[in-house]
């Protein structure tokens, strides 16, 4: 967010989410192919290759993650430093150079630097500012959004989709194939979100998307609750899953990282983002650990009904407490929270 022009910031930050969905899809495809390979070959020796990719194929699935990890590590060295952070630390010349590369205009870069310096000069130390009522409110809202988003089921579906499909009676191979379709819809919908997030607006996407998520989650719960009496096929479950993933990918998955990267003033952005990010991963960890327990003890129907219920407080928080940030500079958003300049959401 800190190296993006305001009118393009939403789609540029959402590229992160697109990269995540491409990673999920790639993992599903690789795992599907490796499973097919292991099932079509018989172990004829004790070689390392056969041990990893046939006898104990999970080792091959895990080991393939090394390749994108190395690519990620390499790309880090080409990422520019945040110009706002450089200006904050007194390295104005380096900050101005980065801004000139972004805006391709010396005049616009200078204007942006002056605005950033003005906002920075009005703020206190990082920890003191973090505890101010307006900023503390933004941090609490960010934490709530990060955690609640995980308990709306998205990572439960992405992590445990094959297991959930197997509970519906599908074979291991068919379950992985269905999960590939889930990953494909997730990726394509994220591309759509990139195209519309700066035109439609963050909050509208959340309203429409979360409403669709609630409906899809309720239908999934109904499927598991009355599957036999209604005579529903696994294709109905697949359609509901794809509908859920579509609504999720076009709304909260695309919006959450944008909102969290926009909400905080420059002097506390690093700390506040760390708190929000930590909260998000705590939520991810909890849902990753709790989902198998919920599927076993709450039943699949109860689990998805719970996910649907968790969508309600998320929607209320975004509706009542989060300002619309589309098209606004980070400095304008900062002034909203610090009450230096009120801009109607």
Which residues does each PLM region occupy?
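Short, well-structured alpha-helical segments
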Residues: 106-118
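Alpha-helical transmembrane bundle of multi-pass membrane proteins
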Residues: 1-94, 98-100, 120-344
